[in-house]
A protein has these predicted regions:
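Surface-exposed, interaction-prone regions used to assemble/regulate multi-protein complexes
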Residues: 1-123
Length: 123
């Protein structure tokens, strides 16, 4: 199992990962899509979550505008819209990734989502 933390050089990380960190990026919104199950594909894409970011105020990586998580399942969390991204941890368990996002609020909270693969939009 690999564990990757933004801002820490922790060895081999997925090419799409924002290694320098998104601290203080603003979450503009979260969109979800469901797709028809395609039985002809070996690993069909069933759904997608898009996390839209304004990273202009982020301390390190200001280029990320959106993160797409495919075949996702939310494990824990509340509404991310309007929150500032404080830190994250990306884990790999078997053939899935788990992204834990810590966002400040009344009490810092954890948003955790499992997914198969991701794409990151950068400006």
């Amino acid at each position: 199992m690999g564990v990757y933390r933004s801002g820490v050089d922790s060895g081999e990380v997925p090419q799409w990962y924002w290694l320098r960190g998104l601290h203080d990026a603003l979450v503009l919104g979260v969109e979800t899509q469901e797709f028809a199950y395609d039985v002809t594909q070996r690993k069909p894409v069933r759904n997608c979550m898009v996390i839209r970011l304004d990273a202009r105020g982020a301390l390190f990586d200001t280029s990320v505008t959106a993160i797409r998580l495919y075949n996702y399942k939310v494990l824990q969390g509340a509404e991310l819209k309007g929150c500032h991204w404080m830190q994250d941890r990306l884990r790999r368990e078997k053939d899935k990734f788990i992204l834990d996002i810590i966002a400040p609020g009344k009490n810092d909270f954890l948003y955790s989502v499992r997914f198969d693969f991701a794409e990151v939009e950068r400006k």
